[in-house]
Amino acid sequence: MIQSYKNWINNSYSQIKENYVEINNLDQKLGDGDHGSTILKGLDTAVANLNIISSEDLSFFMSEISKLMRISMGGASGILMTIFIKEIGNINYDNFRLSILDIFSTTIDKIKKRGKVNFRDKSILDIYIPVYDEIFANDVIHINRILDVLDNALESTKNMEANVGRAKFLDTKGIGITDPGAFSTTLILKEFFKEFVNEKNN
């Protein structure tokens, strides 16, 4: 079971490594300019420790991975970007869909509280909520629909005015720019669903 999680982390690292420069470029327009490098650093730390953490307890394993990432990344990104990675360790394969809904719900609540952010504030929350809604509305998780929802949710952040972080000081000048955190979150969630969603898990 844990091997699938290792695959997910490795694949997420590959996607972020391929796109981190573009993510940084977006963040230069909206924030500190280093979000791509920061999430890459966190995932690099995760990958380096995948075979060092010697535990078959999934909850403990993912908690340790998320902690190492959080420390490596630091700041708000470290806190918010690792919430899902920790929570996914609580997955229940006996009822995969309901378990995913619970994990997304918990992740969304924690992002709201810790990030002081709401839906359509131009943040990672604008990725998690549409995915939750898609899974909630259907009895089966359809991978192609999830991937479409992720793409559409990411695209929608372009038209939002930022209400959090440094980007909020841009007022309407940030409209037309994709949120970098939403970009990295989309890449990571795509790799998660590609790794875990199949007929057996629905």
Q: Which residues are covered by each model-predicted region?
A:
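N-terminal loops that bind phosphate or other acidic moieties
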Residues: 1-202
